[in-house]
Amino acid sequence: MDYNNFGNSASKKFQDDTLNRVRKEHEEALKKLREENFSSNTSELGNKKHYRAQERMSSPLHRLSPAGKSDDRKVKSPLDDKLRRQLREGNTRLPPPPFSSYGMPPTNRSNLDRIRRRTSSPVRTDKFASQNVIDDQRLEIKYLERIVYDQGTVIDNLTSRITRLESFILNSISDRGDKNFASLEHSRSFSGFPTNKTYGLQMGGLYENDMPYRRSSDNINKEGAREDRSSQIHIENESTEDILKILSSSFHN
């Protein structure tokens, strides 16, 4: 005799016998319950037996008998306390219900099988298709938000560069000691920037004593070729890129 596997085989045989006996008693109790409550020979169909509210809310195995028959314990509960304790100790499980494609899959299946069963269901196909559309739209919204953020960053950088150029021009003019230079308010803002600051500019360029402003004599000697070139800065009807080019050229000049 194999004493090593004797306990396992005996325990498995006991569990199988117990499970078969539970199924048989369960079927007999259900059959008897149907015969009592659904017999067409009585005029009190459905009103013959009364059940407690607690039994109506419990599982089917707990409400197999009426409340009045407390002596018939076999019909009241085919799974008695001893059998229930044996089932708990033996860790016996009733067979699971058949898998439905509309329910949750068993936990012992892999994720791939679960995904296949969910996607193969005709009811879930439209739901998953609409979910894919929603996900695509969310990705597109994120992409557009990133574009807007990048454009805002570019605009902020351009604004800071223009501000630095403006401050450099104003500081250079004030350092030359232009006593008669009047800081006139810009009649129009730069294109694309809602600013209305006081620039040392007019719509024809830099002016000094109603004449176009030119460089001092020390710069004229060094840049004789540029003496006759006008230093007017035209910013009317110019794009942001052109304004930056004009300001950059004035910065280098």
Curated annotation (Swiss-Prot):
Q: Name one GO cellular component term.
A: cytoplasm
Tell me the Gene Ontology biological-process terms attached to this UniProt entry.
spindle pole body duplication
Pfam families assigned to the protein according to its UniProt record, in alphabetical order: Spc29
Regarding how it is modified after translation, the entry says:
MPS1-mediated phosphorylation at Thr-240 is required for spindle pole body duplication.
Q: Where in the cell is it found?
A: Nucleus; Cytoplasm, Cytoskeleton, Microtubule organizing center, Spindle pole body
Which regions are flagged for Polar residues bias? 1-12
Which residues does this entry mark as bearing Phosphoserine?
Answer: 65
Keyword field: Cytoplasm, Cytoskeleton, Nucleus, Phosphoprotein
Sites of the modification Phosphothreonine? 18, 240
Report residue spans for region: Disordered: 1-20, 31-123, 210-232
Q: Name one GO molecular function term.
A: structural constituent of cytoskeleton
Residue ranges with Basic and acidic residues bias: 69-91, 211-232
- Where does this protein chiefly localize? nucleus
Instruction: Please give the superkingdom of this protein's source.
Output: Eukaryota
Subunit organization: Component of the SPC110 complex containing at least CMD1, SPC29, SPC42 and SCP110. Interacts with BBP1.
Which protein family is it in? Belongs to the SPC29 family.
Its biological purpose is as follows: Component of the spindle pole body (SPB) required for the proper execution of spindle pole body (SPB) duplication. Links the central plaque component SPC42 to the inner plaque component SPC110.
Q: What is the official name of this protein in its record?
A: Spindle pole component 29
Gene name in the database record: SPC29
